[in-house]
């Protein structure tokens, strides 16, 4: 089988070689009769190639039997042909390339004409007496036998305005780097300003909370219905089980309806008149006292005691002083003192010396009873109030009411 395949391959290879030899012989036989400037026409005869005039050349090569379709065409740019003939157009001379001035431009029929050497260049003279076309630099020091080098002129090279791609890429990289740096600086500035703002924000928030809190404390005074009543200072002393010389909480007097009515019923903004005490029933008065001191004293004064600064009590005890606002009450700040208010009430009613003495004793009893329980303080204040009313009203009806109230007061406190 292998012997049969091998002769088949040899047969195909031999046939291909014979075909190539036949083609080569045929080509050589067809063109072998024509010379360099001849081509063979359709009849098989050798014909002379066309000749073109100045500035013209054949469109394709002609000779040795080829170039039957060649035609004369103008010379290509930067090429010229001065005479008739079979030759092709020649390239024009470049005067700048040989460091010479250009006197005439190149055309299809004439070559460019170059002049003298550029300043700083000279033409070498050959041994046969001819000079080279190319001008060479004079060098430093210049040759003394060349006149062009003695009048050397310093030339300044003008940079090209067209930037290269490399310069463009470099400029783009530099601009990108600058933009990145500026963006980073901007981000750092924003972060710094934000931190500064966050550091200063707590103090601002505390101020706003203080303003908000003060506004909430004064909200009860903004009610239109309070314009018809005169606000008085309401002073109430409260004794706690804290040690001596404890803090005193200053809170505003929240003159709401319930607190104001209860305060007027018992202590009020100052002491009430004897006529009012005579008109009230001792039993109802006894019932009102625990309710007032249990609800009003604990709820109002204890609720707002934390919102006001601490002040040391010189008498050695914890007292809750409910200050009123002068712009709302229209009274002097001295009215906050229970001694002054009690004295003023007694002086206005009768101006008696005994009433002043009772007021001083009342203030002394309050300061001395700091170690007693809360109900004891309430009873002491109530007894002082009744004593002052009794001194101002020596009438028989007033003494009877005072005795009835004194009898009803211990019973009410024991029930509480």
Swiss-Prot record:
It holds the Pfam family TNFR_c6. Residues 321-416 are annotated as: Disordered. The keyword Cell membrane applies. Residues 192-416 are cytoplasmic. Keywords: Cell membrane, Disulfide bond, Glycoprotein, Membrane, Receptor, Repeat, Secreted, Signal, Transmembrane, Transmembrane helix. Highly expressed in adult brain, and in embryos from day 11-17, but not earlier. Detected in embryonic brain and epithelium, and at lower levels in adult heart, lung and liver. In neonatal mice, mainly in hair follicles and neuron-like cells in the cerebellum, but not in the skin epidermis. Isoform 3 was found in embryonic day 17.5 skin but not in brain and liver. Residues 331-351, 360-370, 381-396 have a biased composition (Polar residues). GO terms for biological process: hair follicle development; positive regulation of canonical NF-kappaB signal transduction; positive regulation of JNK cascade. One of its GO terms (molecular function) is signaling receptor activity. Glycans are attached at residue 105. The chain crosses the membrane at residues 171-191. TNFR-Cys repeats lie at residues 33-72, 74-114, 116-149. Residues 1-29 form the signal peptide. This is Tumor necrosis factor receptor superfamily member 19. It comes from Mus musculus (Mouse).
